């Protein structure tokens, strides 16, 4: 580029460099989209805009991509490196590819015909200033909105800092030429497909139009389901029809979101400022799969785990910065207090009560509102656990909202609904101190403005945050595979509850929890906490801690828990240095070196972070525990031990493997442990390697408390085979609390009611006990003996004497 064009673009770039601060999506386009910078690259933009072109240029130069203003020279021919699909509103008033774009596509394809070695990468790019979806009334702009010069100036002036450049996966023009030819008709089709691509992309980024709130209420009131529920309300409560209708409107006011794009923009600015000061980074993985779902027109339901009230804000912030529409979020009614409630409502929150029981009108209004969100194409987010995890582990899922999601499908909607599991991880959770108190029996504080301000005042040095998108679950595909007859239950009016609904919902919920855990994120904090809590004195030398972290990291990298889980790329030493900056640990120096200590008052709180990744290390920990206690054991015996205990572990920690996969998992982990020198293999027997026994023992300690808990329940069951389920749960907790005091176990989840409830249900499902309470003493004693060999003798004596004393 030379002469007047260069001067023109430089002059135009002066105001743009001041007004525009755009983001690239994805953050590293060349790396994440697999662009090969050694091959020619051309850019395709939706319509003619020099401002868009210069904004794209700034991002290309920032990411070491070819300059779009520099033409491509191919076989002596100079061709523009960019193509505008449409000329813009100054010339055309309807969508057809501009002839020039068709000509350029044809020129590029023709070069591929004459040069078999040529392969140009065509990269569609859309530049967006602002993300306002608009309201359903009074706006006529089409989904792919074009602005004339004056409109563009005001858009850039007002929204220049709320802009992004979205790079799409490249298309190989070589493949296009080989498969479809190079004539002008193919060039026209290519332009038409590109135009459709951009229209879809804009809809995915902006979302459907927002309804006027009163219009939405009127539509809901007119629905047959709510009209019938209003009549039932009037009849059952002996009130007038108008009064019953007012009750329904009041419920809509209580439930419905009041989405505001301006509030999203303002909050994005505030959160961007806040995150940069509180967090050292927000790590996002696998967002491209969600962008693709949105582009393909899926109705997306985000299903994250629930660690903190921060989850609401963090996930919406991440989605917004990934070029996606912030979802409508199901929030607990406890958050509907001033001023948080009105703010959350404008950010997309709709409020849900803890229980629907005994209020048919409420359940009908909520179900119809949720169905309306789906039918209009809004993405939705809800926490399938029902509440925040107090232990750091996933809670058993609550299936009410998930059931309503499937019922919405049974209304006969056309858009495919896809569930997207999400793992959210933190290096610091602001409520963790409160969680520990609640697990010890303290009453949960009601959310309020003073409590919110108190929590905000404590926010500092939060380390890293992690948002990992798991494997999506298309509901239609799932139902087609597991309930082929599901379409027979479609009813556009009534909320249908076919016989297959409850077991199917339970199965989907369990699968979602597994997929959330599959996307787990190891980090400096949870790895250091795991190692230090494994030490009985909660302290290790820096060298020992480094060695232990190396063990964990090698296990996770060389035998990954799943393809969606993430492990830090940093070294053990770098992770320890980062964790020490979090001010959770103490360092004592002596003449030999550093000793890193987890203070007693912090130990209980740090179990929360250890539990975040317990599922990722439980299998190698269990194997290490078995090998350590037996000193040497055959592969077959090791597998028998693991298979006997695995059903309980799978249910408790939502592990991913089926029983038939265990042999290959054990082999892979054993090979890695042998490679690390933790064990040796002699005549198909696994032996402890004495030179690395400390590392193996610390690894084994990760399963210690779980095995002790199982030993308690199996001993009680063996000692009293006729014990009923509720008594078994209660007595197991009592013994666990006693064990916790006598042996200094600082893990609040050790005697958590939910953990023992889940365990007893699994024992029923596995046939150890029946609904009537009768157990098979020979089988339970066999498992107890196995567990007794894996725990220390003093713990075993405490368990057995506790029941004898009664």
From Swiss-Prot:
SMART domains: PlsC
Pathways per UniProt: Phospholipid metabolism; CDP-diacylglycerol biosynthesis; CDP-diacylglycerol from sn-glycerol 3-phosphate: step 1/3
Enzymatic reactions: sn-glycerol 3-phosphate + an acyl-CoA = a 1-acyl-sn-glycero-3-phosphate + CoA
Localisation per UniProt entry: Cell inner membrane
InterPro entries the record matches: GPAT/DHAPAT (IPR022284), GPAT/DHAPAT_C (IPR045520), GPAT/DHAPAT_LPLAT (IPR041728), GPAT_PlsB (IPR028354), Plipid/glycerol_acylTrfase (IPR002123)
UniProt membrane topology term: Peripheral membrane protein
UniProt short sequence motif HXXXXD motif, positions renumbered to this chain: 306-311
Lipid metabolism in keyword set: yes
EC number: 2.3.1.15
Residues passing through the membrane, by range: none
Alphabetically ordered keywords of this record: Acyltransferase, Cell inner membrane, Cell membrane, Lipid biosynthesis, Lipid metabolism, Membrane, Phospholipid biosynthesis, Phospholipid metabolism, Transferase
Pfam families in alphabetical order: Acyltransferase (PF01553), GPAT_C (PF19277)
GO biological process, one term: phospholipid biosynthetic process
Class in the EC hierarchy, top level: transferase
Chief localization: membrane
The UniProt record lists the keyword Oxidoreductase: no
Gene Ontology annotations for the cellular component aspect, listed alphabetically: plasma membrane
Domain remark from Swiss-Prot or TrEMBL: The HXXXXD motif is essential for acyltransferase activity and may constitute the binding site for the phosphate moiety of the glycerol-3-phosphate.
Record-stated family: Belongs to the GPAT/DAPAT family.
Record's protein name: Glycerol-3-phosphate acyltransferase
Organism from which the protein derives: Salmonella typhimurium (strain LT2 / SGSC1412 / ATCC 700720)
Lineage: Bacteria, Pseudomonadati, Pseudomonadota, Gammaproteobacteria, Enterobacterales
UniProt gene name: plsB
